[in-house]
Amino acid sequence: MGPITKFNWYDNSAIGTASPTPEQVNALFLTAFTADKGTEQMIRIKGEDFYKMYGSSLSFARHGQVLLQAGKIIDAGGELLCKRIVAYDATLSNIILTVQVTNVTKQEKYADTGQPLYIDAATGDTTTEQYDAELHENEKYTVTNTVIKWLADNSVTNCKTSDEVYEAAESLYQAYNQMPIDDYKQTLPEEERDQLFTDVSYGIYPLYVITDIGRNADVKSIRIVPKYEVSRRLGFMIYTLSEIEGATVNENVTVTANPNLIYNNVSYAITDKSMGELKTIPVSGMLEAYVTKLSELTGIPYEQLINMDVFFGCNIKGASIDGVTVDTDGIDISGEFGVKLASGSNGTEFDYNGTTAYYKSDAYAEALCKFYRGYSVQANDPFPYDDQIYNVDVHKIVACVDANYPIKVKNAITELADFREDFFVFRDYTTDVYTFADALDVQSKLKKTRFAADYLTTYDVIDPYTRKRIRVTMMYDLVQPLVVHFSNSPYAPFAGVINGFVLSNAIEGTINFVPVTTPEFDQIGLLDDVRVNYATYHEYNGDLTVVSLYTSQDAYTQLSYVNNVVAIQEVMRALRTACPRNRYRLQTGNDFSDYKQACSAVLKNFTNWFAGLAFIYQQDDLEADQKIFHAAIEFAFNNWVQSEIFDLYAIPTALVTE
């Protein structure tokens, strides 16, 4: 048996018919969604980083309930283990920052008239006369400059990964630098071709591959700005590398062109880890090759040039290097809005702006199922899904909250919860349920388990971003009290005003189904029988309140209540955190009493959560020889009131005593 902490569930709590703060500061919720931008990797994220990653304006129209709901978890103080879902045929925004360096020899012109200049054969002075007195042609007066030019239109189409763009960059270098000079001339504008004479030296270098961190439509730009004031004091050139969206600068980092420079034990070289919102990948050997060529053309030693402004042809004080100019017809990598990445798309499977909600499509459902099952159903998928979703030691998830997901996705999440056993699933019945019969139909399609609870209430709310009405399930509002409850008192009932389970955003009159008891039909009793949870209004507070908390398992036991299951799961997570700290400590013989004490110390923190909590070490020599510590934990649960029965008696007045 490997080094793991394993739990076996035994439910001996059949019901008859007659605290310390958890170690995990932020409750961790599992979710998956589409978004306008962001990484495609499964990540943990919280706070403002969520909005920096996925966008500050969350669109219900484009991405449905789940993205807004994820934002509400973040706003309530929760943490997400999440994945941005992307269409299979989406492409990656990218640009290859490519620099051309050329020795251009051209005939100088007279500044005032624009006439070409010549060298008078007799005097050696410059002249505008093409011929001397004897009608011999004068030599053209030429000047050779080293010209730096940043090339445009170096974006690669139909790429899904940065590796594909990188391969294209390497091919680009080979294609450019093996080109005969006459062929190269033909790539230039016609008016520039006559500037080139014999013995032209040139080189074209794709220095950096810049890509978005996830596939999506083009939204980002890159900018490189020289910082001469700071550089002159440091003695080497530094730049500000910026990621920009529209007119907003999202990120600035300080970098150097010199890949080997270390300052105060820190490297400021541009790498693929330089930025959080973009990948900035140096093309191997290109910066060195470019500076070597620049050194060859200018005569400045490489060791000196590498610490100068090789991007803009200046020294560290901002003065142009003698004989070096920057071609203003190239792209301006230091411009206010930077250079925009191109060739990205959202693909065709998920039409964010279409008339049909893509989040009800089979393609979307399949992509979500892939995530929640931890694998890719397409062998050639460039982004295989992460089986670390099964890692119970690293990702201590507390809950996954449904968000109007398709039925098959709800079941995929439930299967994950059944396998892990350490987090709880809050499932909705979609926004299409309006009757008791509708609820039963959805229930019949869902897997039943003690690790999931079902909720049928839906209603309209005001979209906080557009101020329009949108239809949501109660999960939209439920996440806020869930974050608070998991952080403060997960052992208490997940219902009622006293525990904060009020759904305050529901627009009155839009709720789908409010069960009542009539002479013909006891809707409240029937929902109780099938253990479907709901919310209803109470006169005393006027707010929509969650009033039941059944799990979906068939058997009626103490594990038919959400808070009892969640309380045990909290204990599991605490032990799973503590046990690895005590593994491999030498014990005396087969007596693991020291290990028992370590576990008991953890459980002592939870005694107030339960009516009874017993820890029993089951010493077994055979298991001890196999290095296995085996113990039993018995839980008895606190009671609480869900319903009230009052017996009302009418008695004779004579029986009333003073």
Q: Where does each model-flagged region fall?
A:
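A glycine- and small-residue-enriched flexible loop/hinge signal that marks low-structured segments
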Residues: 1-121, 125, 129-596, 602-623
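Compositionally biased, low-complexity/repeat regions
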Residues: 390, 608-658
